[in-house]
Amino acid sequence: MAKAEQDKSSKTLDIKLNRILAGNYQSTDFIIADAKDADMAFGVRAAGPRAGRNFEDNGPEIFKTRSEYLQDMREVIAQGVLDIILTSASNGEKLFKDKALGKKITLAVRGNDASDIWNPRGGNYPASPSRPFATANLKIISKFCDLVLYSMTFNNDLDHDIRTLQAYKEFRMQAAEHGVRHFLEVFNPNTPQNLQPKQTGSFVNDHIVRALAGVTSEERPKFLKIAYNGSESLRELSEHDPSLIVGILGGSAGTTRDTFELLYRAERSGGRVALFGRKIQRAESPLDLV
């Protein structure tokens, strides 16, 4: 078992997951996560620009600092509404050591950072097929966290997709060795090959089910994180296997109405988790939105 594992009976995430899997879902069991792992993608820009500044600007005093980012996390944790806070390994460790997490919220750490999330200013990595990569060390992470996010991207590109699946297999073996649970993020293709846009939802659904068909219960993800590809696509996946709890990612920033409309449509179509990052961070009042 992970060294960081605590009594899960008080964690709202595990309480809700158990109710959902038992077929006793109610709207109050919808799981809310704040994805504050943007430092793994955007570097200095992770916490966002200061008022009046632009996300593409450069220079000192333009972006919020790491300390401010951590303070944002402490404030949203203290609010007591979230079930999960997702961070980078370094920030998760800091929150744990500072005893900022409390008893009810679950800390999750990004377990890999494939190339399609690399977004430095001036960079162009997402224009190339996703390549698997992981900075984080699960052995070290297990000392303070027992839940990690693992992400995959399929592009209908045989060589790259095989590497993606092989890396996921290796990750699962390491996670089992160190007693770490995971949830699985499957992005839409970032450089799709011979794939029509209207096929994206079914392509992703089939890849998820196919990839997990050979994974036994001990290694299966606790839930999924995918893009919302329409109600029919989400309903197809959520109805296919009740043991797969499906969650949606928030994507880019939007209006408050956009956020609640997405939540409504997702839940109606079988979604049971929302993992929002920029939609919370760039809201006019992040705490009120949560």
Where are these regions (language model features)?
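Glycine-enriched alpha-helix->loop->beta-strand junction motifs that scaffold or abut catalytic
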Residues: 81, 102-106, 217-220, 239-247, ...
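Active-site glycine- and acidic-residue-rich loops that bind
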Residues: 11, 156-166, 253-255
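Alpha-helix-loop-beta-strand connector modules within alpha/beta enzyme cores
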Residues: 97-118, 164-178, 202-209, 234-253, ...
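Catalytic beta/alpha-barrel core
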Residues: 84-90, 108-110, 151-164, 181-183, ...
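Alpha/beta catalytic barrel-like cores
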Residues: 1-156
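C-terminal helical cap(s) of enzyme catalytic domains, especially alpha/beta-barrels
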Residues: 267, 281-290
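Conserved, mostly hydrophobic/aromatic
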Residues: 185, 277
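Short secondary-structure boundary segments
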Residues: 89, 250-251, 278
